[in-house]
From Swiss-Prot:
Gene source species: Stutzerimonas stutzeri (strain A1501) (Pseudomonas stutzeri)
Family in the record: Belongs to the class-I pyridine nucleotide-disulfide oxidoreductase family.
Entries under PANTHER family matching the protein: DISULFIDE OXIDOREDUCTASE, SOLUBLE PYRIDINE NUCLEOTIDE TRANSHYDROGENASE
Cellular component aspect of the GO annotation: cytosol
Position of the signal peptide: none
Residues binding FAD: 35-44
Biological process per Gene Ontology, one example term: 2-oxoglutarate metabolic process
Function: Conversion of NADPH, generated by peripheral catabolic pathways, to NADH, which can enter the respiratory chain for energy generation.
Cofactor: FAD
Record text on cofactor binding: Binds 1 FAD per subunit.
A Pfam family matched in the record: Pyr_redox_dim
Lineage: superkingdom: Bacteria
Entry's EC annotation: 1.6.1.1
Protein name: Soluble pyridine nucleotide transhydrogenase
């Protein structure tokens, strides 16, 4: 067994692992990264964020073609199979792997591909994919192994028609009808993707409202547009059993309902990838969801072991994971790059997309904060009209007295881009955070960004 010595060893090469490794090596530390795949990038690149967003983009282009009156003069609507659309995602994945591999090589970070488990608090044993066993000794470790779909034991995921959010990328045909169980972010995104391909989707939600953490108006808008695209949403339902057949799948619900479809997608919960890390060898325990607890510096109960990304739970976003990993390394190298990552914008890539940051109306009302609302509807924006994207709005919540921007909520075309303007203002201290910024700033025209000016005027006109 070969033994290698490092300052920092990072377990996982997804966004959190990459952020940690890059920050540590830039501070002069000798760094190694271990990943259980033969390529870097983590679940985000290979099975999660990148392929699903590439899929969404392709489906959205198909929908635009089929609904744009300009193209109706050319020919009939076109439909593509799921495998055809998936090919574009595979190209993006390949490019992302190439880019990220070059990052590690350029920064002289050693990469090991295999399964790592702790021998003690100062070392891990790596069973490499080629069968060799290596021992990595380090002063500090960062656990960034990510998460995987939670799989209930009573569902047969080996059945050829039953999928989770990882295996759905192996779907080799376009089903006529699909059941998606779990109406969280992943479930809603895939409901948009498959309905955009003409699939009849039953979306099963065990709550009363879709994505209840969102502003109520945004959540209601999402429900409307999913239904408008032939997604049947069933709220307050729980599964009793999933019956796999040769020609389909039957979902038995506790309410007594039975639903049959050609394919079944389970998207209800995720679990941290900690079960193979040998945490018992160092006295570190994961919770029932496979997640490890950390303090505000991303340090676990073991002083030299840190964790970041999905493996620590909320918010389980790739964007937050990168910053958490970078901050964990910042705590190790003490280069003033540490911060507790809590100003995370929500980006949900449904069709249309959603993004928000800060408080929503429900939270502000419960906290008895006097706020006002400013709105800009995309149907009135020149850029949205030019782009044939009339659906959506920008909503700004601000304090009635101080004019401080308290929340920004966006639904529609380029929402995940638009939100960052509001985020930048909300991060300013004192009077610099003011809704008046938007009325005193010249925006390019026509742009989606000018929705901030329209919404700001709308909100200020409500004051008296």
């Amino acid at each position: 067994m070969a033994v290698y010595n490092y300052d920092v060893v990072v377990l996982g090469s997804g966004p959190a692992g990459e952020g940690a490794a890059m920050n540590a090596v830039k501070a002069g530390r000798k760094v190694a990264v271990v990943d259980n795949r033969p390529l870097v990038g983590g679940n985000c690149t290979h099975l999660g964020t990148i392929p699903s967003k590439a899929l969404r983009h392709s489906v959205r282009q198909i929908m635009q073609y089929n609904t744009n009156p300009l193209f109706r003069q050319i020919g009939e609507p076109r439909w593509f199979s799921f495998p055809d659309v998936l090919k574009s995602a595979e190209k993006v994945i390949s490019k992302q792997v190439t880019s990220r591999t070059s990052y590690y090589a350029r920064n002289r970070i050693d990469t090991f591909f295999g399964t790592a488990s702790f021998s003690d608090e100062q070392s891990v044993e790596v069973v490499c994919l080629n069968g060799m066993v290596e021992k990595l000794v380090a002063n500090q470790f960062v656990i960034a192994t990510g998460s995987r779909p939670y799989r209930p034991a009573d569902i047969d995921f080996n059945h050829p028609r039953i999928y989770d959010s990882d295996t759905i990328l192996t779907l080799s045909h376009t089903p006529r009808r699909m059941i998606i169980y779990g109406a969280g972010v992943i479930g809603c995104e895939y409901a948009s993707i498959f309905s955009g391909l003409g699939v009849l989707v039953d979306l099963i939600d065990n709550r009363e409202q879709l994505l209840s953490f969102l502003d109520d108006e945004i959540s209601d808008a999402l429900s409307y547009h999913l239904r408008n695209n032939n997604v049947l949403i069933r709220h307050n339902e729980e599964y009793e059993r999933v019956e796999g057949l040769e020609n389909g799948v039957i979902l038995h619900l506790k309410s007594g309902k039975k639903i049959k479809a050609d394919a079944f997608l389970w998207s209800n919960g995720r679990t941290g990838n900690t079960d193979k890390l040998g945490l018992e060898n160092i006295g570190l325990k994961a919770n029932s969801r496979g997640q490890v607890q950390v303090d505000e510096h991303y340090r676990t109960e073991i002083g030299n072991i840190y964790a970041a990304g999905d493996v620590i739970g909320w918010p389980s976003l790739a964007s937050a994971a990168y910053d958490q990993g970078r901050s964990a390394a910042g705590s190790i190298v003490e280069n003033d790059s540490w911060r507790f990552v809590d100003d995370v914008p929500t980006g949900i890539y449904t069709i249309p997309e959603i993004s928000s940051i800060g408080k929503n109306e429900r939270e502000l009302t419960q906290a008895k904060i006097p706020y006002e609302v400013g709105k800009a509807f995309f149907k009135s924006m020149a850029r949205a009209q030019i782009s044939f994207e009339p659906v959506g709005m920008l909503k700004i919540l601000f304090h009635r007295e101080t004019l401080e921007v308290l929340g920004v909520h966006c639904f529609g075309y380029q929402a995940s881009e638009i939100v960052h303007i509001g985020q930048a203002i909300m991060n300013q201290k004192g009077p610099a955070n003011s809704i008046k910024y938007f009325v005193n700033t010249t925006f390019n025209y026509p742009t989606m960004a000018e929705a901030y000016r329209v919404a700001a005027f709308d909100g200020l006109n409500r004051l008296f």
